[in-house]
């Protein structure tokens, strides 16, 4: 397994090993005993039938360094504290009303994206970088408020974290060898990032508290409530089993920023990649978008709710290219028998969502991009159908699905409405390199560069 850790094709390698050794496969990763799940049948056992037994997270050097007292939602151990953090996230931060409230941010940032593309017509455009800038802006403004120097600094730190996530810390594989903790090249990089995060976060909290004291509404760098304001309000009013601390707020904000930026940008670049590679689908989805939005020069989220084929295109993209190709690892907290094998306590659980989404035993012509397949398959983002788990499933599934999907749908609709797209240098669709690179998310190995030609001008 160690030779796979340094490759760009770890998802492929694990899938190939599973074809030889079975859908539940044991791996010895240094001192860490791990099992890899590569089928929906076994995933159902660990994510549904025995979900609580596999609800913990393994302790990693990175989380110990980056988090304050290991307080957050994503990597905290399962229990009363985790349940409170989950409630905070789903009820206060990512409920339907809050996602809708941030619609104006998404619409403004999509407008900026469209304008930036209009200024570069007929020239190769690095869409990967444009998508990253867009999702960074949407998530940061929703989280901390107005555009500012702090936002720019924060985006850079989040990008640094994402780049480090592509590697691994050998001390995580040999936790008993203390010398490795000292010699690890990852540790000083993480410590540098932590210092930057502390400085940025403390300034963000200070600014928010000062502005809350100055405004009658009690919040707002811009007079509107962002997610930091929400958490400060929750902290002030209390009423939870555990008092909401500044460390909790730090952890949740970090979860939001990491979870809401790279994943959405990755989904956008893969969707556009698949559309360029599949002209039939591109023509069909553009026809739907342009018919539904015909005559409009200013477009809002409400205008795109009926774009059913666009939604199928996004679903199919996430089947083939789940941003978290290997779901965040879990830890067995209670010994269980899975698929006839006894799984001991403290075994690390790895779920290959990429392999499950391409399983030819369930998906017809599994490697082909066919959005229409979802007309006949009951599969949504809620994790009920274990053959389709781009956001995970069970207690630990992603709580930010609505926010993430909203951040993908609108820019796609507008880019397809306003522009025609082609590959540069006369390249044919089938020649587009679709190689992947494994990191914080499963991104394209090479940036997606396309040429846009104006079709329907936007309202300046």
UniProtKB/Swiss-Prot annotation:
Keyword terms, alphabetized: Heme, Iron, Metal-binding, Monooxygenase, Oxidoreductase
Protein family per UniProt: Belongs to the cytochrome P450 family.
Binding site for heme: 398
Organism taxonomic ancestry: Eukaryota, Viridiplantae, Streptophyta, Embryophyta, Tracheophyta
Cleaved signal peptide residues: none
GO MF term (any one): monooxygenase activity
The protein's name in its UniProt record: Cytochrome P450 CYP71D312
Cofactor: heme
Alphabetical list of InterPro entries matching this protein: CYP450_71D, Cyt_P450, Cyt_P450_CS, Cyt_P450_E_grp-I, Cyt_P450_sf
Pfam families with a match to the protein in the record: p450
Enzyme Commission number(s) from the entry: 1.14.-.-
Function: Probable heme-thiolate monooxygenase.
